[in-house]
Curated annotation (Swiss-Prot):
Location of this chain's protein in the cell: Cell inner membrane
Function (record text): Required for accurate and efficient protein synthesis under certain stress conditions. May act as a fidelity factor of the translation reaction, by catalyzing a one-codon backward translocation of tRNAs on improperly translocated ribosomes. Back-translocation proceeds from a post-translocation (POST) complex to a pre-translocation (PRE) complex, thus giving elongation factor G a second chance to translocate the tRNAs correctly. Binds to ribosomes in a GTP-dependent manner.
A single MF term (Gene Ontology): GTPase activity
Recorded family membership: Belongs to the TRAFAC class translation factor GTPase superfamily. Classic translation factor GTPase family. LepA subfamily.
Assigned keywords, A-Z: Cell inner membrane, Cell membrane, GTP-binding, Hydrolase, Membrane, Nucleotide-binding, Protein biosynthesis
UniProt name for this protein: Elongation factor 4
GO biological process: positive regulation of translation
Pfam families linked: EFG_C, GTP_EFTU, GTP_EFTU_D2, LepA_C
Bilayer topology term: Peripheral membrane protein
EC number: 3.6.5.n1
Catalytic activity annotation: GTP + H2O = GDP + phosphate + H(+)
Family annotation (InterPro entries): EF-4 (IPR006297), EFG_III/V (IPR035647), EFG_V-like (IPR000640), EFTu-like_2 (IPR004161), LepA_C_sf (IPR038363), LepA_CTD (IPR013842), LepA_IV (IPR035654), P-loop_NTPase (IPR027417)
Native species: Chlorobium phaeovibrioides (strain DSM 265 / 1930) (Prosthecochloris vibrioformis (strain DSM 265))
Length: 605
């Protein structure tokens, strides 16, 4: 039975897109309060939807969150509003694109004190591509430093709308929120009434429940889903029974039926986390749809790093923890690997540095894992002399120089929005990081948008932090992948007493190799503790040593018991000590502390 049109016409599915820290989670709190989904007394913390400790601490949204609200309009009609709260950081744009596919409208939130930022523009383009109705909202209008007129002009230049269409709110104080609710009803289109078609539902998120297995969050695009239906997942053709379906209103609320236009959840005893692929389409097993929903792209990791347990007995625990994390995080990719220095571990693929930090912190907090992380790398393409192409995501897999014809590395196109005063500083940073400057657009008299192309390897380290510090916090950035280009890259090895430490190897541009080698040896000298024998730290390209530092041995004063006496007696004791140290050096292994692996990340400090 197709659902009646009036019901579908009363549904509004929308999301909030904004740059990090522009107040979207606070605005979501006000909407929840206005629709009586929660009252103030239940809000034990600000940002109700950011329920991970990490999200609150860092002040960012990491996971997509869906919540259903009931709202009675000024005209007295009842509406169902489904809000999908999305992340705003560079690394999490895949979460945004999936959430957008489940909506018809988007609130574009811009901070009245900051103006349009790089991530705002990136997410806005994603929303326009998805064909969403955009409602621009200027937030924080009650702050003394707000510049509402200036920001309104930026938004008009960006999406070419009338000034009257821009709403002004203060999410914290609740100003302008009632008008915003009415605008959502009036301007966001209702979902298409496709209840008569075969079932197609888009999975936009999933979480792991220890008792129920995978809980899948989905948006019903076509057809009807009933409790007890047999459903099939397009990606792997597996069939499950819909044990429980329902909607999310802060807590799960079971229902018998989900109809076209609804946003809800599905529990069907999915044991293996890999069966609930985010972005996949769910259909009926007995009367399936012909093709899956369009628009989902497979997520490709951009940054790779090795994660190793400090205690090698915890390898299986680490595997389990990563498996559970990867259900909640569709973009985390991992494969087992071994390292001579660190033993058994995993090579993990991440979307960016923030994503990597968050996974590490979640492993440590939620799963009590003690882990060592190696230097982040990107994926290189190596063309061999025999015509073969090898993908290298780990410096230890880099083939011998004699067998390489050329090496290609991934490049990204980046836009940086900043105050005009900092153009010089940013140009200098761009030159340091092998960036290619393209052009500059003036957004208004004070703010500019600069376009660069960078090798991805140059921005995965500390580029974001450096950009913030040279622009006194004003600059914001966003980047997208544009393909591979040939580069003159070499593998830089670190040797301790002539033995290479594979976990400290890095791939760098030839022009920077000497400088890196010198800095790295100096840094390691300060970190590796003194041994009973001398330790030589060397940086090498192939068989050529380009830099060296020596950690002198700790030595006991063997002459302390000689009060005066014959010089030959003293010499004999010193020679004996030397012999002992030489023997130690042959059998001794230098313990490399965790800080040494992190030293490469902040080599310029």
């Amino acid at each position: 039975m197709a659902p009646s049109s009036p019901e579908v016409s009363r549904i509004r599915n929308f999301c909030i897109i904004a740059h990090i820290d522009h107040g979207k989670s606070t605005l979501a709190d006000r909407l929840l309060e206005m629709t009586h989904t929660l009252d103030r007394t239940q809000m034990d913390s600000a940002q109700v939807l950011d329920d991970m400790d990490l999200e609150r601490e860092r002040g960012i949204t990491i996971k997509s969150h869906a919540v259903q609200m009931k709202y009675c309009s000024v005209a007295g009609d009842d509406y169902t509003l489904n809000l999908i709260d999305t992340p705003g950081h560079v690394d999490f744009s895949y979460e945004v694109s999936r959430s957008l596919a489940a909506c018809e409208g988007a609130l574009l939130v811009v901070d009245a004190t900051q103006g349009v930022e790089a991530q705002t523009i990136a997410n806005l383009y994603l929303a326009i591509e998805a064909g969403l109705e955009i409602i621009p909202v200027i937030n924080k209008i009650d702050l003394p430093s707000s510049d509402v007129e200036g920001v309104a002009s930026q938004i008009i230049d960006l999406i070419g709308i009338e000034r009257e269409e821009i709403l002004q709110v203060s999410a914290k104080a609740g100003l302008g929120v009632p008008e915003l609710m009415e605008a959502i009803i009036a301007r966001v289109p209702s979902p298409a009434d496709n209840g008569h078609l075969p079932l197609r539902a888009l999975i936009f998120d999933s979480v792991f429940d220890a008792y129920r297995g995978a809980v899948v969050y989905l948006r019903i695009v076509d057809g009807v889903l009933r409790k007890g239906d047999r459903v099939r997942f397009f990606a792997n053709n597996k069939v499950f029974l819909a044990d429980e379906i329902g909607t999310m209103s802060m807590k799960r609320q079971p229902k018998q039926v989900l109809e076209a236009g609804d946003v809800g959840y599905l529990i069907c005893s999915i044991k293996d986390v890999k069966d609930a692929k985010v972005g996949d389409t769910v259909t009926h097993a007995d009367a399936p749809a012909d093709k899956r929903l369009a628009g989902y792209k497979d997520v490709k990791p951009m940054v790779f790093s090795g994660l190793y347990p400090v205690n090698s007995n915890e390898f299986e625990d680490l595997r389990e923890s990563l498996e559970k994390l990867s259900l909640n995080d569709a973009s985390l990719v991992y494969t087992p690997e071994t390292s001579v220095a660190l033993g058994f571990g995993f090579r993990c693929g991440f979307l960016g540095l923030l994503h990597m930090e968050i996974i590490q912190e979640r492993l440590e907090r939620e799963y009590n894992m003690n882990i060592i992380t190696t230097v982040p790398n990107v994926e290189y393409r190596v063309l061999m002399t025999n015509g073969e192409t090898v993908i290298v995501d780990n410096p230890s897999k880099m083939p011998d120089t004699a067998r390489i014809t050329n090496v290609e590395e991934p490049y990204v196109s980046m836009q940086i929005i900043t105050l005009a005063d900092y153009i010089g500083n940013i140009m200098k940073l761009g030159m340091e990081r092998r960036g290619e400057y393209r052009n500059t657009d003036y957004l208004d008299t004070k703010r500019v948008c600069m376009h660069f192309e960078f090798p991805l390897s140059e921005i995965v380290f500390d580029f974001h932090d450096r950009l913030k510090s040279i622009s006194k916090g004003y600059a914001s950035m966003d980047y997208e992948y544009i393909g591979y280009r040939e580069s003159e890259l070499v593998k830089l090895d670190v040797l301790l007493n002539g033995e290479p430490v594979d976990a400290l190897s890095i791939i760098v541009h030839r022009s920077k190799a000497y400088d890196w080698g010198r800095k790295l040896c100096g840094k390691l000298k300060g970190i590796i503790p003194k041994q009973m024998y001398e330790v030589a730290i060397q940086a090498a390209i192939g068989s050529r040593i380009i830099s060296r530092e020596t950690i002198s041995a700790m030595r006991k004063n063997v002459l302390a018991k000689c009060y005066g006496g014959d010089i030959s007696r003293k010499r004999k004791l010193i020679e004996k000590q030397k012999e002992g140290k030489k023997r130690m050096k042959q059998v001794g292994r230098v313990e490399v502390p965790q800080e040494a692996f992190l030293a490469i990340l902040n080599i310029d400090e």
